[in-house]
Amino acid sequence: MTKVKKVKYNKRKHIKVGDIMQNKLTKREQSKQNNILAIQTFKNQGYTVAQTAELLRLSKRTVYRYWDNTDYKIFNNISEVKTETEQYITKEKYKYQIEKGKDLDYEWEKILSKRKEIATYTELKNEKGNKLWFVETEKIKSAIDYIEIKAKDDLLKYSKSLFKNYISSEEMLLDSLADESFYSSTIEGAFSTRKVAKELVMDKRVPSSKSEKMIYNNHMALKYGLEDKESQITEDLMLKIFELISKDTLDEETQINKYRVEDVVVRDTRGEIIHEGAHVDNIQSMMDDLFRFMYSNDINPIIKSAIFHFYFVFVHPFPDGNGRTARATSYIYLVKEGYDIFKHFSISALIAQKKSKYYKCIKDVEDNELDMTYFIEFILGVVSESIDIILDKYTRKHIENYIFMELVDKGVNITNDQKKIIKYILNKENYSATIENYTKKNKSSDYKKVNKDMNYLTDIGILTKSKEGRHNLYSINVIK
């Protein structure tokens, strides 16, 4: 078994504090500059991307981004450092960054003008006839590159190994659909647990409350969409998805045949109005525009799915269930477009954690002249982060399976308690834990017994032992 040699590396030492103060380098810029220098140093020393990510405690995505140093230009004078992926801020944020004495409206208009010069204008419009647009920022390009190339390759590599030897693809899909059904419903106010969601999906338990019905309905809608044989998403498919999502959850007075017949508003987590849905007389024409847009241009499908998501919520065609229907339909669209990697994880899981930001991005589009860049960057960021999470999960599972297969091949037997220790350490962020960590987490564990088990696992080469202060630190002795 091989192990990456642990080395101490101080990313900050390459930039002097005086330089930072003198040139007013922001904390964000400083952090990025430090990351670049650290990554380039490890690359030059022959480390791989995975090893560099582990040693610097960065995500693989971050390391990939800086590996060939294409996103950031390093100059001798730090004050000249410019990021090509400069944060795409709103006017609301810009007013805190503008130099004293400069006119906010005038300076912002210059920024807006430059953005519009390179923007992509869509055929989607608001009720006043103004087109929605976006800028394909370096952040968006980087996310698409990661999703389509790096993530796809790694997910396929790990998933093929896992499905071949340890779990079924059906089991993985059910697990992912259970998560998506649960989190998409909680965003809209359902109260339940992941355990209940998995019971509803995997054990086919009958839902007993409105919240459980929302989760179950969401699952049935996703399942229906994935089994649909048509190559494209259509209005009829979307209406069927809504029908399944809203079944037995709408109040009697809000039951509808197709689209809503009353005007509505969208509220954020604090109950504040962030958007007024389209007037009932305009819903049909705007939805027609949306489905026509999905198949009438060469915009990247990942960007297009984010636009579909936004515009659907923007129009708000139904009295309830708009968010769930938008997320389910955009998910199904991506799978139909050949992005099977989206079957591996739940996008809604992170949206649920970032719910305030989610609603804020919707509002930012309206407050900044229908610029959808804010929402697209947010959604693609969520997708990229979701991929990081599932890749980390697959990597840990892959290492776990590798360890246990090695033990079987070598005829080494270990106890169930020792297996639990291995699994516990594999789930720790840095693949390391002390005896104190383990016994605190597992209150019934006997300290002496755990000490004996960890030392045995060290003796047979599964773990390594080092010092962390006064305690022994046990780490997984395999990087595969």
Spell out what each predicted region is.
Residues 44-45, 69, 296, 460:
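Charged, alpha-helical scaffolding/interaction elements associated with membrane systems
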